[in-house]
Amino acid sequence: DAEGLQIRGIDTMGGKDVNDLYFTNCFVPDSAVVGKPGEGWRQLMAGLNLERMILAALMQGVARRAFSDTLAYVREREQFGRPVGSFQALKHRIADMATELECAQLLLDDVAAAIDAEPGRLFAREASMAKLKCTELAKHVTLEGMQMMGGYGYATEYGMEALLRSTVVSTVYGGTSEIQRDIIGKTYGL
């Protein structure tokens, strides 16, 4: 209800609430100012790093769910008299997914512990690494799961397609994967 503020909803593939905000001669009274003058960028970055960690953790959960559903499917689905998961090609893909999930979890846990240990520090590189790894991995694991499940992976009945839709936007929110790579690179002086 602020004068000069207009909000326009955007329909999205995943059904998530996304809006455009328009500010036209919008006045913010002193009582509504958040933080101290001149510290807006630092506050914004702290918020973005928190958002990145939340997205990383959320997508790690989505990836684990997709992995679990895929694993159950390849154990149950039979071809040529045995579970499809017993074939080397799928077994190796499952092994790679499991390994990457564990690596992502270790990174996520390590960054979260570091943030807890030093609350005032921004941890831009580390938060970007966790967000990049966990969101890209979630997208990869859901696509792999969908592929291994064949037509069932695409069907709404099994839920893999819904998991995939949630992963697509995660690589955009909080800064795209390319932005995360740029942030990480800059922290190494590049």
Give, region by region, the residue ranges found by the protein language model.
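Residue-level recognition of specific faces of alpha-helices
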Residues: 86, 93, 100, 126, ...
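Conserved catalytic-core motifs characterized by acidic clusters
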Residues: 32-48, 73-87, 147-163
